[in-house]
């Protein structure tokens, strides 16, 4: 089969490189979450892909950067009392996030050029990696437009652009992770007693939808909602969920509705996964791993909300969502490319 043939052509070095790139993106997601939660993302008011590699050096350079920050809505409305020392802390967190993005980009680009030069990649892989390279560059542009949306008249970024930034990271991660799986799981067999690829594809869609609403929750600060809101107390009041007109705006603009949908999808994913695993009775490591990651993610989500979005828990909750998606993708590819074992 063609896939198996391509897999045999992928050398160990390429597999290691793909794995490192995936880990790098997970680290970026973690640091990105910390940057948002510490309100550091708007501290750097310019986008300099080359010069921006170097941080301010000396007192005068730091003062110049702070003067630029003083013109932003965030300073005027929220951080008007910030000291130079406090500004440095915010700046360096955002600086590290941007620097890490450059490092991850180079971690992908340089080995890609090397493996291409050494003819370690077949034509299809080269095309795929060129697309990924362009997406990484585009991610930098999307990130800047997201930051820019918080430098005009509001002291926070657009939750839509924040979501686009996160989903693009998820897409890049998926493409790299999928290629890693195709390169690693090389056995192809169709001796499958029960085909569960459709339901796990649906679970993938649900997880992506959940990540989308999780990002909207973050952008709208819905995680900081009063814990006595009706639906949290076991009651459902439509006036809280549907007070914005037209009604469909509530799905994306109403923090109460967005948080409610986020919790609803989480419950749905949990039930679908549990029921599916019980029905199919999969005796597979990735199936057990999926269940463990799902329970961990639900626990992190509940604790994050209950304790008013602490930085550590919220950051772990965000990156674990990517890991959950990766594990489900792993299981999906395992079912497609490997022989399944079932407990009768």
UniProtKB/Swiss-Prot annotation:
Keywords: Cell membrane, Heme biosynthesis, Iron, Membrane, Metal-binding, Oxidoreductase, Transmembrane, Transmembrane helix. It catalyses: Fe(II)-heme o + 2 A + H2O = Fe(II)-heme a + 2 AH2. Pathway: Porphyrin-containing compound metabolism; heme A biosynthesis; heme A from heme O: step 1/1. It is found in: Cell membrane. The chain crosses the membrane at residues 14-34, 95-115, 125-145, 162-182, 198-218, 260-280, 287-307, 311-331. It is an enzyme of class 1 (oxidoreductase). Heme binds at residues 262, 317. Its cofactor is heme b. GO terms for cellular component: plasma membrane. Its main location: membrane. One of its GO terms (molecular function) is oxidoreductase activity, acting on NAD(P)H, heme protein as acceptor. Its EC number is 1.17.99.9. It is a multi-pass membrane protein. GO terms for biological process: heme A biosynthetic process. It holds the Pfam family COX15-CtaA. Signal peptide: none annotated. HAMAP family: HemeA_synth_type2. Catalyzes the conversion of heme O to heme A by two successive hydroxylations of the methyl group at C8. The first hydroxylation forms heme I, the second hydroxylation results in an unstable dihydroxymethyl group, which spontaneously dehydrates, resulting in the formyl group of heme A. Belongs to the COX15/CtaA family. Type 2 subfamily. Interacts with CtaB. This is Heme A synthase. It comes from Ehrlichia chaffeensis (strain ATCC CRL-10679 / Arkansas).
């Amino acid at each position: 089969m063609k896939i198996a043939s391509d897999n045999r052509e992928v050398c160990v070095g390429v597999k290691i490189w793909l794995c490192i790139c995936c880990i790098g993106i997970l680290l970026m997601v973690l640091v990105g979450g910390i940057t948002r939660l510490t309100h550091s993302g708007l501290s750097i008011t310019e986008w300099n892909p080359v010069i921006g590699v170097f941080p301010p050096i000396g007192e005068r350079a730091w003062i110049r950067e702070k003067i630029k920050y003083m013109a932003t809505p965030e300073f005027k409305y929220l951080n008007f009392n910030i000291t130079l020392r406090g500004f440095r802390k915010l700046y360096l967190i955002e600086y590290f996030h941007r620097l890490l993005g450059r490092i991850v980009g180079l971690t992908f680009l340089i080995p890609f050029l090397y493996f291409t030069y050494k003819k370690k990649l077949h034509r299809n892989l080269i095309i795929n990696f060129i697309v990924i390279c362009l997406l990484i560059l585009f991610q930098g542009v999307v990130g800047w437009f997201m930051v820019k949306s918080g430098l005009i008249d509001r002291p926070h970024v657009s939750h839509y652009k924040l979501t686009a930034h996160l989903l693009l990271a998820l897409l890049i991660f998926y493409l790299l992770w999928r290629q890693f799986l195709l390169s690693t799981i090389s056995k192809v067999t169709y001796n499958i007693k029960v085909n569960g690829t459709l339901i796990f594809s649906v679970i993938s869609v649900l997880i992506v939808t959940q990540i989308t609403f999780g990002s909207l929750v973050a952008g709208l600060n819905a995680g900081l909602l009063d814990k006595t809101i009706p639906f949290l107390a076991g009651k459902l009041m439509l006036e809280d969920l549907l007070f914005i007109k037209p009604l469909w705006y509530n799905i994306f603009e109403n923090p109460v509705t967005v948080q409610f949908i986020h919790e609803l999808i989480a419950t749905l994913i949990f039930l679908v996964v549990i029921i599916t695993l019980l029905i199919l009775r999969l005796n597979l490591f990735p199936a057990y791993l999926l269940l463990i990651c799902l329970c961990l993610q639900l626990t992190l989500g509940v604790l994050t909300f209950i304790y008013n979005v602490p930085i550590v828990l919220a950051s772990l909750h965000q990156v674990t969502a990517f890991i959950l998606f990766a594990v489900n993708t792993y299981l999906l590819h395992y079912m497609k490319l490997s022989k399944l074992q079932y407990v009768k």
